[in-house]
């Protein structure tokens, strides 16, 4: 087992990475201080893993309840969140009750938000079961739900007590879900570590096949980068915003198509291709770097051509973004591979990238 620590002073917490973690009661024990835990999971994950976690918690002498929610991004909303609150109140959960998020990013985000809100804050543990949630969304304390007008617009920062990333759970992922998680792995290399990006390029075939050793290293490499960023900028006032590389375009794709039509990682993958094109168009990266990002995204079985939402609709959707200020859209771009920054961009260049992303094969030279 590998452990990466998120250094937030008295709110620091461990990220444990390895195989067979769901059954290890000793990993849960330090973080469940009350008499009860409530597992929040979904209809897909519950039959696979809920019993293992329940058994581990009961072996500690704790009561455990399990809330099973519908599966999918389209359920990341108020109605579903209220089902968690209903279950907590019905079970008599108190301020020492620990919530356990057992599932992917949707479950993690909603469980964390419920933990932030219930009785003004209760502890929770992240047990991510998808690649995307293991390498990204389970780390850093961002929680929330979607609104019809924008993704993740309602939420809170609420750090977990611990993250248990069991690599074994990735073996049951559909290929499409595994690919979606690779988008965030690629993102971390692109924004923070060119050597890590090159390692992903060299090992993409084995990663696509979910090789255990390679996947363990990918999760470790990504959470190492994210943990370092979160430790420096927990509330996303500066550096942490660079973790949104590809997300401004990606969130617009998700909202424009309807949540759930594309997986989040698929939209981020395409968004990274678009952000790389915009970075090149503005003179920050060369054509080879842009094409490396596009080629690796494609090799990870992610979409590289954007849906035809229309340029004006894309721009309208991107204005509803947490990074936007006074209606001005901000983008995470690359100065070079491994170095990202946040900026505004000229409207003409943005429109050119949007047209290019839909109409041109992504490896062609940009349209002037």
Curated annotation (Swiss-Prot):
GO-annotated cellular components: cytoplasm
Binding locations of Zn(2+): 184, 247, 264
Domain of life: Bacteria
Top class in the EC scheme: lyase
BP GO terms, sorted: amino acid biosynthetic process; aromatic amino acid family biosynthetic process; chorismate biosynthetic process
Residues annotated to bind NAD(+): 71-76, 105-109, 129-130, 142, 151, 169-172
Assigned keywords, A-Z: Amino-acid biosynthesis, Aromatic amino acid biosynthesis, Cobalt, Cytoplasm, Lyase, Metal-binding, NAD, Nucleotide-binding, Zinc
Catalytic activity entry: 7-phospho-2-dehydro-3-deoxy-D-arabino-heptonate = 3-dehydroquinate + phosphate
EC number: 4.2.3.4
GO MF entries: 3-dehydroquinate synthase activity; metal ion binding; nucleotide binding
InterPro entries, per database record: Dehydroquinate_synthase (IPR050071), DHQ_synth_AroB (IPR016037), DHQ_synth_fam (IPR030963), DHQS/DOIS_N (IPR030960), DHQS_C (IPR056179)
Pathway listed: Metabolic intermediate biosynthesis; chorismate biosynthesis; chorismate from D-erythrose 4-phosphate and phosphoenolpyruvate: step 2/7
Stored NCBIfam families: aroB
Family: Belongs to the sugar phosphate cyclases superfamily. Dehydroquinate synthase family.
Function of the molecule: Catalyzes the conversion of 3-deoxy-D-arabino-heptulosonate 7-phosphate (DAHP) to dehydroquinate (DHQ).
PANTHER family assigned: 3-DEHYDROQUINATE SYNTHASE, 3-DEHYDROQUINATE SYNTHASE, CHLOROPLASTIC
Name under which the protein is recorded: 3-dehydroquinate synthase
Species: Ralstonia pickettii (strain 12J)
Gene symbol of the encoding locus: aroB
């Amino acid at each position: 087992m590998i452990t990466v620590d998120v250094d937030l002073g008295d709110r620091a917490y461990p990220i444990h990475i390895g195989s067979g973690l769901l059954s290890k009661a000793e990993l849960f024990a330090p973080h469940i201080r009350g008499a009860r835990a409530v597992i929040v999971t979904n209809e897909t994950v519950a039959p696979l893993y809920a019993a293992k976690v329940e058994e581990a918690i009961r072996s500690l002498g704790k009561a455990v309840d399990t809330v099973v929610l519908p599966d999918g991004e389209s359920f990341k909303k108020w109605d579903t969140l209220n089902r968690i609150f209903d279950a907590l109140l019905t079970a008599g959960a108190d301020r020492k009750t620990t919530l356990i998020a057992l599932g992917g990013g949707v479950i993690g985000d909603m469980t964390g938000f419920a933990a932030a809100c219930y009785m003004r804050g209760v502890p929770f543990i992240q047990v991510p079961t998808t690649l995307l949630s293991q390498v990204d969304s389970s780390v850093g304390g961002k929680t929330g739900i979607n609104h019809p007008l924008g993704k993740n617009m309602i939420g809170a920062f609420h750090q977990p007590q611990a993250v248990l990333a069991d690599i074994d759970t990735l073996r049951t992922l559909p290929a499409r879900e595994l690919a979606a998680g690779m988008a965030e792995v690629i993102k971390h290399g692109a924004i923070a570590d060119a050597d890590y990006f090159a390692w992903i390029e060299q090992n993409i075939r084995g990663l696509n096949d979910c090789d255990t050793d390679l996947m363990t290293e990918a999760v470790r490499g990504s959470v190492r980068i994210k943990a370092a960023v979160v430790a420096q900028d927990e509330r996303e006032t500066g550096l942490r915003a660079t973790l949104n590389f590809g997300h401004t375009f990606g969130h617009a794709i998700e909202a424009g198509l309807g949540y759930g039509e594309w997986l989040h990682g698929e939209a981020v993958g395409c968004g990274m291709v678009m952000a790389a094109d915009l970075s090149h168009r503005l003179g920050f990266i060369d054509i080879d770097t842009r094409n490396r990002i596009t080629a690796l995204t494609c090799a990870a079985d992610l979409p590289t051509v954007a849906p035809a939402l229309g340029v004006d609709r894309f721009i309208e959707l991107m204005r509803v973004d947490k990074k936007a200020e006074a209606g001005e859209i901000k983008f995470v771009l690359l100065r070079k591979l491994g170095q990202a920054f946040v900026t505004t961009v000229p409207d003409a260049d943005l429109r050119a990238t949007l047209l290019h992303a839909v109409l041109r094969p992504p490896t062609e030279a940009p349209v002037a």
